[in-house]
Amino acid sequence: MSAGTPYFTAIWTYDTSATSFGNHTNEARRRGGTSFELFDDAADYLILGDEDRFDLSYFDIDTAGSLGDLTWQYWSMDSGTNEWKTFVPSLADLEGNDEEEEFDFSEDGAELFLDLPNWGSAVYTASGTEPDAVARYYIRVTPASVATSPTVKMVRKRSYNAYCSPSEVYEFLNLRWTTGGF
């Protein structure tokens, strides 16, 4: 399990023309590590996966990309019809993001994944040549076109379990002695 770590347990690329996966999980963990290319062509995928739910991914870009519109998808366990659902990432909606633009792999940055109804953990299956058969929460992204493919040095995540619940904050701060609660 990867609970509390900033690293994904699966960083894969999928080349649709060659129907092959690239497993970049280890390279993506190294600060200043070996760069790897994300998309050769339109319709190729970058796949982010982890056994624990996550709500943010950070990309340390080495070569700026020039891509067409991005399509982001997550694996939905929606009432028995498990399928990829398209969504719009949430970073553009954050206060303080003056440009209100989505992350586009043209520079270092992050993307936020907040409203993913029925996001579920499953084994990734596409062509039978997947790097492993571990059930994870997956998000994937594909560009409409590729003028310049971005390369990335490192990819990080923020786990849902990086947050404290109100009761954990209450216990941690020992508020029962100051509020009279038991």
Predicted feature descriptions by range:
Residues 1-25, 76, 91-102:
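Predominantly extracellular/luminal regions of secreted and cell-surface proteins
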Residues 1-7, 78-84, 156-182:
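Conserved short "hinge" loops at termini or chain/domain junctions
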Residues 2-19, 134-162:
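Exposed low-complexity, polar/acidic, P/S/T/G-rich flexible segments that act as propeptides
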Residues 20-32, 179-182:
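Short, polar loop/linker segments at the starts of domains and inter-domain junctions
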Residues 29-58:
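Contiguous beta-strand segments within globular domains
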Residues 45-49, 96-146:
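Beta-sandwich interaction modules
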Residues 50-72:
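A short beta-strand element within beta-rich, extracytoplasmic domains
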Residues 66-119:
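Non-cytosolic beta-sandwich-type ligand-binding/adhesion modules
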